[in-house]
Design a protein with these regions (language model features):
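C-terminal, low-ordered peptide segments at domain boundaries
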Residues: 92-166, 213-214, 284, 298-330, ...
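Solvent-exposed loop/turn segments at secondary-structure junctions
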Residues: 112-115, 146-150, 176-182, 198-199, ...
Length: 442
């Protein structure tokens, strides 16, 4: 499950359009659709299917009904008649629905779009971990841009935390964190829970499609190789902290494990999933909500409030002062204790080569697809296949880096160009998603 803001990545959400367990990290840009022209019949069909999906799946049934009614009425009034290109239509549907639902995760976008975020602009740092430094005064500093899937996040975090062992305080920088998998969020929080104590950190409430029935998936603290329980913990937050990044801050605050410093966060707490709605269009629909076991609520629509309110640019300096250190401690003699891996995960290059080798087939080989991705995953895989079909055989394939979303990035070398792609597999080696291909700038 994943949370991400609307300014990020149709490509990732669409690439990783797995089941709801993936849905809390990424939200597509409404403007990331293709330039397909839409006739009145296509527009009517898209609105009708989107309304059906909202009524069946949106986490709050009554609110979903209001959204469905709003776009149905708008279509009947002729409000969409002049929106003949897919990007404009997708943007208008997104805006209309957000005006009713007030949900920053919801978005409509084109399934065969060029990625809303290029591979080259994906945050660096293995599995979302950008930096792990030991600052002056024995202060551990950890910057995390996102929470990737737990099978890539946990080993990377374990290496970072091992290097920070023995610190007297911890600063977690979430100011640029746009979300991720709640299992990975809970694993980070577990480092600050007293050893031997198992507590419920968060839960996700899911709506069963077509009903008003709800299920709850709890996330508990886990044993970690290194513990920082009892140490002063400061979490830096700001307006760009969103979704899973907000969950980390909310968990730390409600469980009284640390202090939040900075500005109020973005306010997105409803995870979801992308669904095909016809004519090359997808909709990301929140099908769940976060629920704190402490408050019974979450941060949706209002954000997480800091304990110490300062401009987010001043948050690190403020935390350092609270710890008795000069703000210069952030730049004087930091010692990096984390080096990202320099080799691809097992199977990622082989899977990429297999996808390229099969690109001429009319349909992708669905036996390669992770089992839990469902129909949205099949649609995403088909779109990936279509994006790869125009490519020739690369002269060479080179591993570039692990990225901040838990994907492995590769360059595809051709005589006249070099392309970037990023691929994600599940723990069993099955395909979960691909971003790109994107041209490498000269």
């Amino acid at each position: 499950m994943r949370f991400r803001p609307a300014t990020l990545l149709a490509s990732l959400l669409f690439a990783a359009a797995a089941g709801p367990t993936l849905a809390q990290t990424s939200v597509p840009s409404a403007s990331s659709a293709t330039s397909t022209r839409l006739d009145p019949t296509a527009r009517a069909a898209i609105v009708a299917q989107l309304a059906t999906e909202l009524r069946s799946r949106y986490i709050y049934p009554d609110v979903g009904e209001k959204g469905a009614a709003a776009i149905t009425a708008a279509a009947a009034s002729g409000a969409y008649d002049r929106l003949t290109d897919l990007p404009s239509f997708a943007r208008r549907l997104t805006d209309d629905l957000r005006g009713v639902l007030h949900d920053k995760h919801l978005a409509v976008f084109g399934e065969t779009n060029r990625p809303a975020i290029s591979v080259a602009s994906i945050p660096g740092g293995e599995a979302g971990i950008v930096r792990a430094d030991r600052l002056a005064g024995g202060i551990a500093y950890l910057e995390i841009a996102g929470f990737s899937n737990p099978w890539s996040f946990k080993p990377a975090l374990d290496r970072a935390m091992a290097g920070l062992k023995g610190s007297r305080a911890v600063i977690l920088d979430m100011r640029g964190n746009h979300g991720g998998d709640p299992a990975s969020v809970s694993y980070l929080v577990s480092h600050f829970v007293p050893a031997g104590k198992r507590i419920e950190i968060n839960r996700i409430v899911w709506r069963k499609a077509g009903t008003r029935d709800l299920t709850r998936k709890p996330f508990f603290s886990e044993r970690t190789p290194v513990s920082f329980a009892g140490l002063p913990v400061y979490v830096l937050i700001g307006g760009h902290t969103f979704s899973g990044g907000e969950e980390l801050a909310y968990d730390i605050q409600t469980l009284k494990l640390g202090t939040l410093v900075g500005e109020t966060t973005g306010g997105g707490a409803n995870p979801g999933q992308s669904f095909p709605i016809g004519h090359g269009v997808m909709a990301f629909i929140p099908t769940g909500r976060a629920e704190s076991p402490v408050t019974g609520s979450n941060w949706e629509g209002r954000g997480v409030q800091p304990d110490i309110a300062v401009p987010d640019a001043d948050a690190l300096a403020t935390a350092l002062r609270r710890l008795g250190q000069s703000p210069a401690a952030a730049t004087i003699s930091p010692v990096s204790v984390f080096t990202q891996r320099a080799v691809p995960l097992r199977g990622s290059e082989a899977m990429l080569r297999r996808l390229l080798a099969g690109r001429a087939a009319p349909e992708p080989d669905y036996t390669l697809l992770a089992a839990d991705t469902g129909e949205p995953g099949r649609a995403a895989f088909a779109a990936t296949h279509r994006r790869l079909q125009p490519l020739g055989d690369p002269q060479a394939i080179h591993f570039r880096r692990p990225d901040g979303f838990g994907f492995d990035e590769f360059t595809l070398v051709y005589p006249d160009q070099t392309l970037l792609v990023a691929i994600e597999l599940d723990p069993s080696g099955k395909f979960r998603g691909l971003i790109g291909p994107d041209k490498v700038s000269p």
